[in-house]
């Protein structure tokens, strides 16, 4: 009723009514409901958002990523950052162009079981099965890749131009997107506005603003006063009022920065790009000195009187870091069996541990050069206090013991060894792949050698399809633990000074005991850190109008008591479990004669 259709095919069991203008050049699937819409049309040969250039990281261009339906965070990372390999970039662009042209059409499609209700203009948009579009203002030149396993919801007041929205995502409540890619199971709402940005799996954006950002998996920003601009993030939480500057009022907005995985910002933090913040670090205050702390992960960056103070490694003992690592896998909302991004959640991996080895060397060298009694050390335009430096070396060594011990226990589990030779054979890696440097390609942790092998394949033309590129990333993700052991075994020899030909059960027992000390020591620090949340100062403001006892009672009713807190009991259980795990291996091999 009240519908004008031009060059439209309609599937079975559809209801289309009250279209103010018309629907033109569309194929509409079955069981679809379209009501109270202004106009739906395709007015030219369209690629539906595929092939649109997104000027990510550098607002003035130079790092453009070509959007496509199959875009993964890892593919985009290489396209944006590996500009030192122009042949690779040209090949990747032509692969993306081939895909875009293959899917170009002058006829749009609306899938099966789609609902489009009370919506304004839909122009040059391809809409997948089971999609809900309700109260949306305008959609122009894009793809909504909804499907039965992971429907997409686009809600009231949304305006999207030049976009792709992947399966399972929800874009709602006045969100405005221009030249944006939205990955799987993202949630954007509450008037969020973004331009020239890429959001990959499980990102959340509410209230604030994004410009030219590369938001890797689990980038979360919830606050009205937060602007993320020209930065690369992943597993990141932005505090309210966090922003960055990419403009120094000289040659325009040409600067960019990186916050490596797990870095987060406190309220009112500010960073003047260019800068690079190490993995799992916390940024507090205003930082204008362009520090690069990528080799000092798990740090605090604190500003005092316009100076950046660095507290290396301290975040390793933070209860918040452990809580973050536990929550990300639980918050992976992707239901689509065909996942675009391969996400490695490990807190300690060859990627972070290699940085700790470097960090430990840097701190020891600072100590040697400036002298052990120096009160303040300078590194990368940041200051490090003497006590912080010594603690940093200790924290990094604890984490290295923990990671290498974990690896060796995993490698030797479930086998009853009779001789040292059997142990040596089991310790030998299954592959040479994994030696050398490792990289975090926006969520995927892999040996640099494997990434380079893929890039060489793209350059010489042996890898020439989007699905082949994604299959290579899948293979690296699949083989992570095999590659990890190759790297870990090499580091075990180096760190503990062992020879693979003469390693004995007693050497292994020594490593396991060091591991037990590290794990229990770290857990105790985390336990003490959690205890601070139950201190008297944390009770301030509880028990309104009451006495001291009522304050404690009110606090316990709301927050529970320390000993029965679920996180605290989990830490205590972790200490027990890990001690038992180490003892089990020691018992299994202690009888072997040297």
Predicted regions and their residues:
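Long, charge-dense tracts
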Residues: 13, 21-22, 26-33, 38-48, ...
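Long, compositionally biased intrinsically disordered regions
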Residues: 37, 304-593
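Glycine-rich hexapeptide-repeat left-handed beta-helix
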Residues: 9, 15-98, 134-135, 144-148, ...
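N-terminal cofactor/phosphate-binding cores enriched in small/glycine residues
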Residues: 1-3, 7-12
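Surface-exposed loop/turn motifs in large extracellular/passenger domains
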Residues: 2-3, 100-103, 107, 120, ...
